[in-house]
Regions:
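Outer-membrane beta-barrel and related beta-rich outer-membrane complex signature
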Residues: 122-130, 207-212
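Flexible, surface-exposed loop regions and adjacent strand-edge segments
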Residues: 81, 127-134
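Flexible, solvent-exposed coil segments and beta strand-coil junctions
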Residues: 1-3, 25-30, 67-76, 160-165, ...
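Amphipathic hydrophobic-ligand
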Residues: 15-23, 38-48, 67-99, 105-111, ...
């Protein structure tokens, strides 16, 4: 049996999909998705896969490719939050068992890769946040005037899905002055996330701002633990690794307080 579906436009909850074409075939309780193409969020998606109904619990396997997706539009539809922009590309192979949402999430396993071209985070300036933390802990302030938001370098990362969590492996990006490496996980059900962000000054010889001078003296990665929720309107809460910052922190009471906060 073979079925083809061709739709000019499909309205979903909060967004629209256009130019939808799907080709299904079935044989001996296996439904094959030969192709599913659609335009969405300013880009397009290609999906192939199958559903195996030969056992008591159905098993599904999908290969998902997203191309040139407008990240701001997608996040606004999913989380009502559009503070991150860029052009998203993603390849993901995923498999799961069952038919209800809870079983699908709990059994999902997969892997893939993601890249974002010209990423922009409008909520905070990451360099300013890092400088504020380092200079405050060192008992001084940065006099630099900072632009709003953070324009990042093109980023890439490896993805893994397991037990209801989306794990991000070795996300690599950076700003004008700082290299950034990040890894962590997002709980798909609660949308809570926690990441370890490591920042390193690119070229200490160009460290003109006081906070960058402090970083250049350390000449090592500065780790931050960041926590938040993808549905929240506020930016993530990030705490620096007190042991690494060690010599920068002059106030013992403040150091002890930050240790307690970072352990919460």
């Amino acid at each position: 049996t073979q079925i083809e579906i061709d739709l000019e436009q499909l309205k979903m909850d909060g967004f629209e999909i256009s130019n939808v074409f799907a080709d299904f075939s079935s044989f001996r309780s296996i439904i094959q998705l030969n192709t599913l193409n659609a335009d969405l969020f300013g880009g397009y998606a290609d999906v192939t896969g199958l559903v195996n109904l030969q056992r008591n619990i159905p098993r599904s396997e999908l290969k998902i490719n997203l191309h040139k997706i407008n990240l701001s539009s997608m996040l606004h539809s999913i989380t009502d939050n559009s503070d991150t922009n860029g052009s998203l590309n993603m390849d993901l192979n995923i498999a799961f068992n069952g038919i209800d949402l809870e079983n699908l999430l709990n059994s999902a396993v997969g892997s893939g890769a993601i890249s974002v071209m010209q990423p922009l985070y409008s909520e905070i300036n990451l360099e300013q946040t890092l400088c504020s933390a380092v200079t405050f802990l060192g008992g001084s302030r940065s006099s630099k005037k900072w632009p709003t938001g953070t324009l990042l370098q093109d980023l890439s990362a490896e993805l893994e899905v397991q037990s209801g969590s989306l794990m991000v492996r070795e996300l690599i990006s950076g700003t004008e002055n700082i290299d950034l490496h990040l890894h962590g996980a997002v709980d798909i059900r609660s949308r809570d996330y926690q990441f370890l962000l490591k920042a390193r000054l690119k070229d200490p010889s160009n460290a003109q701002d006081s906070c960058f001078n402090k970083l250049s003296k350390n000449s090592q990665d500065i780790p931050f633990t960041c926590r938040g929720n993808m549905s929240a309107m506020s930016p993530p809460i990030c705490f620096p690794d007190i042991d690494v910052l060690g010599g920068v922190i002059k106030n013992k009471v403040l150091s002890d307080l930050l240790r307690k906060l970072s352990d919460l």
